Amino acid sequence: MLGALLRLLSACGGVWPTSPAPPARSSSSSSAAAAADQAAAEGRDGLLWWRDLARCHAGELSVAVVQGNHVLEDQCRVESGPPPLAATCIGVFDGHAGPDAARFACDHLLPNLREAASGPEGVTADAIRDAFLATEEGFLAVVSRMWEAQPDMATVGTCCLVGVVHQRTLFVANLGDSRAVLGKKVGRAGQITAEQLSSEHNANEEDVRQELMAQHPDDPQIVALKHGVWRVKGIIQVSRSLGDAYLKHSQYNTEQIKPKFRLPEPFSRPILSANPSIIARCLQPSDCFIIFASDGLWEHLSNQQAVEIVHNHQRAGSARRLIKAALHEAARKREMRYSDLMKIDKKVRRHFHDDITVIVLFINYDQLAKGHSQGQSLSIRCALDH
């Protein structure tokens, strides 16, 4: 199936034209030329937005988002900044029950990380954890403040996937079921292979169900199978998130929230957690690129399919190309043409696919090893209307 998909992507290359990698410029390049580069690489087509290729401290990256929900619930952000935090920071935020938590996390998590890492130790797992905690506390303060006027804020949450490349170390932190996948070369032939870096906190995973049951031994209904899908308390698939105050603090489990979110019995300790899984990895010369994406992509593509699509094409437009492959597969599953899928309005598009966010980071190992950085400071956010 992958071979056919790759041939289809090559044959349809004219649908979403890609930009070649920008040539290297001297430090005297004008700001007007830089702006022209950005304009050429960034675009929008209906419910799709992209930034084909941009230089950052860790190498180059490609970003794309397609809207599937009536109101966009995915958010993303890239910050590749100057000292004191000379690092490339990536955030993918997949909201649920509304966009508010994802928007808040997008606004605050990476700035909180910059602040947490401003001390002498710099970027560490503890600094990242502190940034997640500060963002969670900030959003819960908003929920508390708006409780009487807007109680639905207590039922809004988001998955959070954060990647940080600082010097030659990669950190990946995750709440929920977005995913980071490394494409690396193995063997003498340099065959590309996928390695999943993030842990997924989804009740459909056996180890997640076991973790929940161990944490709540007195609750036989901590996970329930509904319509073939495992859910925490029969309500939500993810076991860790930012927000979702109604499953963390019992004062929000009242008649003020919608019946579908209400628990029939009180609870004495949080059901969901905001404690991220964090890995630290020393990057190697064989590590080529990392795909950061919300679960909307992984519903339709395997890890290996995704890394092969990136590896077998030029860098520019990689994120768009992955989204296009996922949408082709979504259309195939519904026995419809891709062109017809793309005509469907956002009011009903969610019946066919979720919001999908993809960020592909191409690692420049030599640059990192020398302690050099290329490009100016970079800040990217999705420009899709909500």
From Swiss-Prot:
The keyword Isomerase does not apply. Its EC number is 3.1.3.16. Keywords: Hydrolase, Magnesium, Manganese, Metal-binding, Protein phosphatase. It is an enzyme of class 3 (hydrolase). PROSITE patterns: PPM_2. Pfam families: PP2C. Residues 60-363 form the PPM-type phosphatase domain. GO terms for molecular function: metal ion binding; protein serine/threonine phosphatase activity. Binds 2 magnesium or manganese ions per subunit. GO terms for biological process: regulation of intracellular signal transduction. Mn(2+) 1 binds at D94, G95. It catalyses: O-phospho-L-seryl-[protein] + H2O = L-seryl-[protein] + phosphate; O-phospho-L-threonyl-[protein] + H2O = L-threonyl-[protein] + phosphate. The keyword Metal-binding applies. Belongs to the PP2C family. This is Probable protein phosphatase 2C 36. It comes from Oryza sativa subsp. japonica (Rice).
